[in-house]
Curated annotation (Swiss-Prot):
GO terms for biological process: endoplasmic reticulum to Golgi vesicle-mediated transport; intra-Golgi vesicle-mediated transport; intracellular protein transport; macroautophagy. The gene is trs20. InterPro entries: Longin-like_dom_sf, Sedlin, TRAPPC. Component of the TRAPP I and TRAPP II complexes. TRAPP I plays a key role in the late stages of endoplasmic reticulum to Golgi traffic. TRAPP II seems to play a role in intra-Golgi transport. Belongs to the TRAPP small subunits family. Sedlin subfamily. Pfam families: Sedlin_N. The keyword Transport applies. Keywords: Cytoplasm, Endoplasmic reticulum, ER-Golgi transport, Golgi apparatus, Transport. It is found in: Cytoplasm; Golgi apparatus, cis-Golgi network; Endoplasmic reticulum. This is Transport protein particle 20 kDa subunit. Signal peptide: none annotated. One of its GO terms (cellular component) is TRAPPI protein complex. It comes from Schizosaccharomyces pombe (strain 972 / ATCC 24843) (Fission yeast).
Length: 136
């Protein structure tokens, strides 16, 4: 399982990033990390176009890069949840996004968090990793 999840803010800034999967060498991890960020960021234009043509929060596979697929989920507050993944079940990806959205809402309700700022909470990270293990 190789996947990269990101929460992108309303100003196209990364709020949270998570890389999952086996990569052994540091150099490969660094190059892979930058490539994942580039692929997801380049797909934001597609998400911006699709969000005006659909009422659904979840957008299945919006783009593809080699054997990797990009799925998206747009919240009512225009936060974009992006997932770069190998071919997975669309239902599992949708459930992953829904639980991530619930977790993000709980974070938003914290008086110590400002919207569009990076999420650095270890508890948030552990919960997202748990959700990812369950569905991805």
């Amino acid at each position: 399982m190789t996947a990269y999840a990101a929460i992108i803010g309303t100003k196209d800034n990364p709020v949270y990033e998570l890389e999952m999967g086996p990569i052994n060498e540091k150099l490969d991890r660094s190059l892979n990390s930058h490539l994942n960020q580039f692929i997801v960021h380049s797909s934001l234009d597609i998400v911006d176009q699709l969000q005006w043509t659909s009422n659904a929060f979840y957008m299945k596979t919006i783009d593809q890069f080699h054997e990797m697929y990009i799925s998206a989920y747009v919240t009512p507050s225009n936060m974009r949840f992006m997932l770069l993944h190998q071919n997975q079940s669309a239902d599992n990806i949708k459930l992953f996004f829904q639980e991530l959205h619930e977790l993000y809402i709980k974070t938003l309700m914290s008086p110590f968090y400002q919207p569009n700022q990076p999420i650095r909470s270890q508890a948030f990270d552990l919960k997202v990793r748990s959700i990812a293990r369950r569905y991805l």
